[in-house]
UniProtKB/Swiss-Prot annotation:
EC code: 3.1.-.-, 3.6.4.-
Superkingdom, taxonomy of origin: Bacteria
Protein name per the record: Endonuclease MutS2
Family assignment from sequence similarity: Belongs to the DNA mismatch repair MutS family. MutS2 subfamily.
């Protein structure tokens, strides 16, 4: 790709956007020099790596690259024998730590991001060097006392001397005789020596060493003789500490250089990972996706099958990065066509469309997702050449047309099979007839060389090529005739009018001038242009009709949805009513259970035949109540499922009384209640308990009753269990208390069902269970008689019981 093509398509801006999303200086440098992949397979692999990095980004997992500075310069200086400064060593330590942490992160995610892990696996797993440097050097860059025992000792000696000197100088300042010779009662440090501000006139009164003087010369900074010895000792201690610090820095730099190869390797890997993470962020910001990468010639051979390329919802990436509203376009080149001729009004987006394709081709070559939707397909173009901006050639004193032809000449020389050629306003800026002939010849030459070509034009002769030659295809950018404005949408398969007169009207040229131009155009040929404008008008009319049809369809769909919603509301009301009936039934059942429990308690307290008979009668009444309530609930469910909702509850309307399972006629309505005639009776029921029966609703109700009756009949006709199976109770293994409770429940059920006898299996055992059972049977009001089983019945291991009737 020539520098000119990259510049004209805006490739440097893409690289700048990528670099801005990298965090390492080395990563940014690598992004700005991002290479193009040599093969289609390499491009697929690069896109897959970006896809894995994007997966990490979507999981909010950022690579741990913090703190790594521009260490390339540090490593180079150390390799030449230089001693690194403390902060430089800290940055190198950050590199070692980032390498270990990044390796650990990607190893843990190896199953999700296998390619990234393969790239990161050579990273150094140990951060021992980083630990050593960070223990010796504080984040501020100061060398820590922990760096060595010698340094700690020298610094402690220095601190002790500072304390002694400060105490001595403060004693001198407090001396009244000394104060008479001082400019002020303070001390300062000059040349690492404690000094006093002595009046120049009192110089001989304060013996010592003069280290400095004020600008006026009236004040001398004197180190008193009594402090010189301590000052010398402090200088020696500081020198020892400084020498130890330099020794530590030399030692750490040496340790760094001993591992310099690994550090350089780690830096290269981290920079590559940083670029991949930046690529993932860029793809996310562009809503970009990896296209299917085709070989350079897939679908582009004359007579070949399939699409040469297809970019769905394509957007110009630079416009997206600028935050502008971008109208997406669907760009496709179908075989056998090899050239796409884009026409339409000025400012309609023709140049944007073809440069977006060119940038997409470059991004794919560099392994970057393109600003198009999933499902897009794009060849791995061997070369991309563009002539969309000749302003640079104008500085060479070339005319616009001459500069354009020079660019075309360069492209003709470089056009090879599998290349992509982009030309904006081909052969414009000259006589239209000659320009059209030249443009057609250029296009044919490029196509014959095996290139895929995208051009923009206003020349009618080029628009007509696709009508007679399958190697060419038309596309147009839309124009809204009512608003006199472009739509920026690309439409495939047809040419577009330049709409120059409409654009002139839009920018505000005088109306008489515009009308004169329109009349002149109509009277002086331009048949293809007029046909294109008529075609645009017809398209606009059809689009309006389609919008009207879609609006009517949407209205019908919404009406149908409202009807369904109303029906669902009615059915929901039925279900809620059934639920309320179920709750009422549950309350009745609970009350009945409580009553039965009370009867049983009384029966156990007074075990008489009369009491048992009364209990059985009460149980029969309870069962009848439960059956009636269940029948009403079933009727309500049937009504909710099969009655046709509709109409309102008003006098004269036939309704189903859900809770009673009966039909009737509404006599009157009073608020939320209604009076209903059901046969010879009149009942007052809540309106919510009534379902209007309209049309076939009565048949549905009958059907519901018929089905309910059949189900009940089927239930009643169900074959009974094998003889004796329901009249047998096995109590082996139970404790006495459990046995008595089970036997009482068993006898109660059989007595209520009208059974005559039963068999209780208790086994032989120790005989205690059998004796407890028979003692209980002797006192039971349910039992008429009992005996040990016959031999064929199980002998004394069973007890046969005859129930009292």
């Amino acid at each position: 790709m020539t520098d000119r093509t990259q510049r004209e398509l805006g490739w440097p801006e893409i690289l700048n956007a990528l670099a801005a999303r990298c965090r390492l200086p080395a990563g940014r440098n690598r992004a700005l020099a991002l290479p193009f992949q040599p093969t289609a397979e390499a491009a697929r692999e690069a896109l897959a790596l970006v896809g894995e990095a994007r997966r990490l980004s979507e999981l909010a997992l950022a690579l741990p690259l913090g703190g790594v500075g521009d260490v390339e310069g540090h490593l180079e200086r150390a390799s030449k024998g230089g001693v690194l400064e403390p902060l430089a060593l800290r940055e190198c330590a950050a590199l070692a730590r980032a390498a270990a942490r990044t390796r650990g992160l990607l190893e843990a995610r190896a199953s999700e991001t296998p390619r990234l892990w393969a790239l990161a696996e050579p990273l150094s797993p140990s951060a021992a060097l980083a630990d050593r440097i960070e223990r010796a050097i504080e984040p501020s860059g100061a060398i820590s006392d922990r760096a060595s025992a010698e340094l700690a000792q020298a610094r402690e000696r220095s601190r002790g001397l500072h304390r002694a000197l400060k105490a001595q100088v403060e004693t001198l300042l407090a001396d009244a005789d000394m104060q008479r010779h001082l400019r002020d009662t303070y001390f300062t440090i000059r040349n690492e020596r404690y000094v006093l501000p002595v009046l120049a006139s009192a110089r001989r009164a304060v013996p010592g060493i003069v280290h400095n003087a004020s600008q006026s010369g009236q004040t001398l900074f004197v180190e008193p003789d009594s402090m010189v010895e301590l000052g010398n000792e402090l200088s020696i201690a500081n020198a020892v500490a400084a020498e130890e610090e330099q020794r530590i820095l030399r030692e750490l730099t040496g340790a760094l250089m001993a591992d310099s190869g690994a550090l350089a390797r780690d830096l290269g890997i981290l920079a590559a990972l940083d670029v991949l993470e930046g690529s993932a962020l860029l793809a996310s910001d562009l809503d970009a996706h990896a296209p299917e990468v085709l070989s350079p010639f897939d679908g582009l051979r004359v007579g070949g099958a399939g699409a040469g390329f297809e970019l769905l919802s394509l957007r110009h990436p630079l416009l997206v990065l600028q935050g502008k509203k971008v109208v997406p376009s669907h760009v496709r080149l179908d075989a056998p066509a090899r050239a796409l001729i884009v026409s339409g009004p000025n400012g309609g987006g023709k140049t944007v469309a073809i440069t977006a394709v060119g940038l997409s081709a470059l991004m794919l070559r560099a392994g970057l997702p393109v600003a198009a939707a999933e499902g897009s397909r794009l060849p791995f173009f061997l070369e991309v050449k563009a002539a969309v901006d000749e302003r640079g050639d104008l500085a060479k004193d070339l005319s616009t047309f001459t500069a354009h032809l020079a660019a075309v000449k360069e492209m003709l020389a470089g056009a090879v099979p599998g290349s992509l050629i982009l030309v904006d306003e081909i052969a414009a800026d000259t006589d239209p007839r000659e320009g059209a002939a030249l443009a057609a010849a250029i296009l044919e030459s490029l196509v014959e060389r095996g290139a895929a070509v995208l051009v923009t034009t206003h020349l009618d002769e080029l628009k007509a090529l696709a009508l007679t030659d399958p190697r060419y295809a038309n596309a147009r950018v839309g124009f809204d005739a009512e608003r006199l404005a472009p739509t920026y949408q690309l439409h495939l398969g047809s040419p577009g009018s330049s709409s120059a007169i409409e654009v002139a009207a839009r920018v505000g040229l005088p109306a008489p001038l515009v009308e004169r131009a329109r009349a002149a155009l109509t009277g002086h040929g331009g048949a293809l242009g007029q046909a294109l404008r008529a075609l645009d008008d017809e398209r606009a009319r059809l689009a309006e009709e389609r919008r009207a049809a879609e609006s009517a369809r949407d209205a019908a769909r919404k009406a149908e949805e409202r009807a369904r919603a109303a029906e669902e509301v009615a059915r929901r009301a039925q279900r809620e009513a059934a639920a309320r009936m179920g709750e009422a039934l549950a309350d009745e059942l609970e009350a009945a259970r409580a009553e039965v429990a009370e009867l049983l308690a009384g029966l156990q307290a007074r075990p008489t035949v009369k009491a048992a008979t009364d209990a059985a009668r009460q149980l029969d009444a309870w069962r009848a109540t439960v059956a009636q309530a269940a029948k009403a609930t079933q009727a309500r469910a049937d009504a909710g499922a099969e009655a046709l909702p509709g109409g309102e509850v008003r006098p004269g309307v036939r309704v189903r009384i859900v809770s009673l399972g009966q039909e009737g006629e509404v006599v009157e309505v009073d608020g939320k209640d209604a009076l209903v005639r059901a046969g010879p009776l009149k009942v007052r029921r809540p309106v919510a308990d009534l379902v209007p029966l309209l049309g076939k609703a009565k048949d549905a109700a009958k059907l519901g009753r018929s089905r309910s009756e059949k189900l009940q009949a089927a239930s009643e006709a169900r074959p009974s269990a094998p003889p004796g199976l329901e009249r047998r109770l096995d109590v082996r293994g139970l404790r006495v208390e459990e046995l008595l409770r089970e036997v009482e429940r068993f006898l109660d059920r059989l007595y209520s069902d009208g059974e005559a006898d039963c068999l209780i299996l208790h086994g032989h055992g120790t005989g205690a269970l059998k004796q407890a059972l028979r003692d209980h049977l002797s006192a039971s009001p349910y039992v008429g008689a009992f005996r040990a089983g016959d031999r064929h019945e199980g002998g004394d291991a069973v007890t046969v019981v005859s129930l009292r009737r």
